[in-house]
């Protein structure tokens, strides 16, 4: 609700709302997933097709909605920042992805949602590795939490990679993130479930033998707040005669 109220203030002031929905290109294709920002009143929405849809790396879309956004201005900035020699392979990949979703998207997402439901039920059987989720979340992202087990997210990440040859998206703190897509196969899901359950069983055995020291959930970590001496955008205003080349070895920061 607070987000909705905030959006209302934005609309009243006639401020264009830009949503970076890079990891949400699959939103809105099935009720199992969150709604697409284009359907929620956003003026500009950015989607990285390659992150969650079948498209080559570096393919993305920018959607312009409503009348608040100056399309000519957006095009001018794109001409300034984008290459003058675009890859036709990448553009063909975008067209292929859009055409696939237009023709077969409904069936693909129906199957995808059902496979994900089964996968999540299987993973929820673990005793120590937990599927983290909130009231509103994207079920296609598998956040594997090892909080309280004594294992770190990076340990889980590299164990899955080196021992089970499963490449996850990232790891940080006490969790690791696994990405899924409409073209994942049951064989891949089975490998993931088997690997996570085996690691979960190892955690159980280590816990009973006191080989791991549990990390308490909600433990606070103080983040240092360094003094801001100079902001990056201010560097452009420094005259050339005041600049000098400095080796990183002699740098303070």
Language-model-derived ranges and their functions:
Residues 12-15, 42:
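A short helix->loop->beta-strand "cap" motif at the edges of active sites that frequently abuts
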Residues 17-21, 45-48, 54-55, 131-133, ...:
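General beta-strand structural signal in soluble alpha/beta enzymes
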Residues 38-76, 82-93:
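Active-site PLP attachment segment
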Residues 120-122, 126, 141-253:
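Non-catalytic terminal extensions of PLP-dependent enzymes
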Residues 1-11:
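Single conserved hydrophobic/aromatic residue that forms the stacking wall/gate
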Residues 92-107, 183-187:
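Amphipathic alpha-helix from the class-I
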Residues 5, 15-36:
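Conserved PLP phosphate-binding loop immediately N-terminal to the Schiff-base lysine helix
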Residues 98, 102-134, 154:
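Conserved PLP-dependent catalytic core of the aminotransferase class-I/II
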């Amino acid at each position: 609700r607070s987000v909705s109220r905030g959006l209302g203030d934005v609309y009243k002031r006639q401020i264009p709302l830009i949503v970076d929905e890079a990891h949400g290109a699959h939103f809105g294709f099935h009720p199992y997933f969150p709604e697409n920002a284009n359907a929620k009143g956003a003026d500009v929405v950015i989607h990285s097709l390659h992150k969650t849809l079948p498209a080559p790396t570096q393919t993305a879309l920018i959607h312009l909605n409503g009348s608040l956004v100056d399309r000519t201005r957006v095009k001018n900035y794109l001409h300034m920042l984008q290459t003058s020699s675009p890859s036709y392979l990448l553009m063909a990949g975008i067209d292929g992805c859009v055409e696939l979703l237009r023709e077969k998207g409904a069936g693909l997402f129906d199957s995808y949602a059902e496979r994900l439901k089964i996968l999540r039920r299987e993973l929820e059987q673990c005793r120590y590795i937990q599927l983290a989720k909130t009231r509103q979340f994207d079920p296609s992202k598998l956040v594997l939490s090892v909080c309280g087990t004594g294992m770190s997210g990076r340990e889980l990440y590299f164990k899955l990679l080196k021992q089970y040859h499963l490449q996850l998206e990232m790891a940080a703190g006490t969790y690791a993130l696994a990405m899924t897509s409409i073209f994942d196969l049951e064989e891949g899901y089975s490998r993931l479930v088997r690997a996570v359950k085996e690691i979960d069983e190892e955690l159980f055995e280590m816990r009973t033998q006191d080989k791991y020291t549990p990390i308490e959930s909600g433990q606070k970590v103080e983040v240092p707040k360094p003094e801001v001496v100079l902001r990056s955008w201010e560097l452009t205003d420094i005259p050339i005669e005041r600049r000098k080349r400095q080796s990183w070895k002699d740098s303070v920061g």
